[in-house]
């Protein structure tokens, strides 16, 4: 009578961190197909039925993120140390190795001793989150909630003191001052407002009150009305016989329109010439030597007033 083949002993896979039944005859892990396995002592073998406990992977026995591609969690250089540093020794992920549901009272000292011998024999691995067996009912005090994990991540990214060893500055991937960015829905409006406030007090100084009062007042003629001349400030057409103020550049304005402007800026709103005849306009960069056609056209449009002023004199 042929004898039954001996049952393989219980082994521990250091890659999967679970107990397995090795694949014979190569003695490799049936899950990861690696040979980094260790035979367990015989005193923990189930002697009631003489067979090794079932090691078929179930949903509760599977390691967290077992089938997730590890490249999905690839972090920039330096961030991996920060991410794993958050999950320190106080963070423990509850897992259930094979047989934990049926034998929760297994001696924890033997398991710690086995892990210690394994690390001593094969060399210490890089620090990582500890995986310890916990009961299915109730939450361990050291296990944080999902909200706590997210809060730790947010605090670590925002707080400069939480990422001292990244070498990326207190704001991580932001390689400049965070105030240089437009944050939120009104961020762009805030930047435009700041720019306008910076240019509010720029430009030529106010004109002298004596020069403003000395500006001549001329009547609007039929030639002005026929040419469609209008006030450059309020854009209203001049009425026949209306009194307007004439600047040295021959541009005509309503008295109520040009006086408040000259009290703040000593320049013509059209050609940017001051009351002394000096041009206060500045050409944009790269346009040096290029004249403004609007000034010449505006001057030409006001030529009838000049002729009229000459004839009246």
From Swiss-Prot:
Pathway: Protein modification; protein ubiquitination. SUPFAM superfamilies: RING/U-box. Residues 103-116 have a biased composition (Basic and acidic residues). GO terms for molecular function: epidermal growth factor receptor binding; ubiquitin protein ligase activity; zinc ion binding. Changing residue 16 to A: Loss of interaction with EGFR and FLT3. No effect on E3 ubiquitin protein ligase activity but alters specificity for 'Lys-48'-linked chains. It is an enzyme of class 2 (transferase). Changing residue 231 to A: Loss of E3 ubiquitin protein ligase activity. Keywords: Acetylation, Cytoplasm, Metal-binding, Nucleus, Phosphoprotein, Transferase, Ubl conjugation, Ubl conjugation pathway, Zinc, Zinc-finger. Ubiquitinated. May undergo autoubiquitination. It catalyses: S-ubiquitinyl-[E2 ubiquitin-conjugating enzyme]-L-cysteine + [acceptor protein]-L-lysine = [E2 ubiquitin-conjugating enzyme]-L-cysteine + N(6)-ubiquitinyl-[acceptor protein]-L-lysine. CDD domains: RING-H2_RNF126. Disruption phenotype: Partial embryonic lethality. Surviving mice do not show any visible phenotype but show increased sensitivity to DNA damage. Interacts with CCDC50, EGFR, FLT3 and SCAMP3. Interacts with BAG6 (via ubiquitin-like domain); required for BAG6-dependent ubiquitination of proteins mislocalized to the cytosol. Interacts with CDKN1A. Interacts with AICDA. The C4-type zinc finger is required for interaction with BAG6. E3 ubiquitin-protein ligase that mediates ubiquitination oF target proteins. Depending on the associated E2 ligase, mediates 'Lys-27'-, 'Lys-29'-, 'Lys-48'- and/or 'Lys-63'-linked polyubiquitination of substrates. Part of a BAG6-dependent quality control process ensuring that proteins of the secretory pathway that are mislocalized to the cytosol are degraded by the proteasome. Probably acts by providing the ubiquitin ligase activity associated with the BAG6 complex and be responsible for ubiquitination of the hydrophobic mislocalized proteins and their targeting to the proteasome. This is E3 ubiquitin-protein ligase RNF126. The lineage of its organism: Eukaryota, Metazoa, Chordata, Craniata, Vertebrata.
């Amino acid at each position: 009578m042929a004898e039954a083949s001996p049952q393989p002993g219980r082994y521990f896979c250091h890659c999967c961190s679970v107990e397995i039944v090795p694949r014979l005859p190569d003695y490799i892990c049936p899950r990861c197909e690696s040979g980094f396995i260790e035979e367990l002592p015989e005193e923990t073998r189930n002697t009631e039925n003489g067979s090794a406990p079932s090691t078929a992977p179930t949903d509760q026995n599977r390691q967290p993120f077992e089938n997730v591609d590890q490249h999905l969690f690839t972090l920039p250089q330096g961030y991996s140390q920060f991410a794993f540093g958050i999950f320190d020794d106080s963070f423990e992920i509850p897992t259930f190795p094979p047989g934990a549901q049926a034998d929760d009272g297994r001696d924890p000292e033997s398991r710690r001793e086995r892990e210690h011998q394994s690390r001593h024999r094969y060399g210490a691995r890089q620090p990582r989150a500890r995986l310890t067996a916990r009961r299915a009912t109730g939450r361990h005090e050291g296990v944080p909630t999902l909200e706590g994990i997210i809060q730790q991540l947010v605090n670590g990214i925002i707080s400069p003191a939480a990422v001292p060893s990244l070498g990326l500055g207190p704001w991580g991937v932001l390689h400049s001052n965070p105030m240089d960015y437009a944050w939120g829905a009104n961020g762009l409006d805030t930047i435009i407002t700041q720019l306008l406030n910076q240019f509010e007090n720029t430009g030529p100084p106010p004109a002298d009150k004596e020069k403003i009062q000395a500006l001549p007042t001329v009547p609007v003629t039929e030639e002005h009305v026929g040419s469609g001349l209008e006030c450059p400030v309020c854009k209203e057409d001049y009425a026949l016989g209306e009194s307007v103020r004439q600047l040295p550049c021959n541009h005509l304005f309503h008295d109520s329109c040009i006086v408040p402007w000259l009290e703040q800026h000593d320049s013509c709103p059209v050609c940017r010439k001051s009351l002394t005849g000096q041009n206060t306009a500045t050409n944009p960069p790269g346009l040096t030597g290029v004249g403004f056609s609007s000034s010449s056209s505006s001057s030409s449009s006001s030529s009838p007033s000049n002729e009229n002023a000459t004839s009246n004199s």
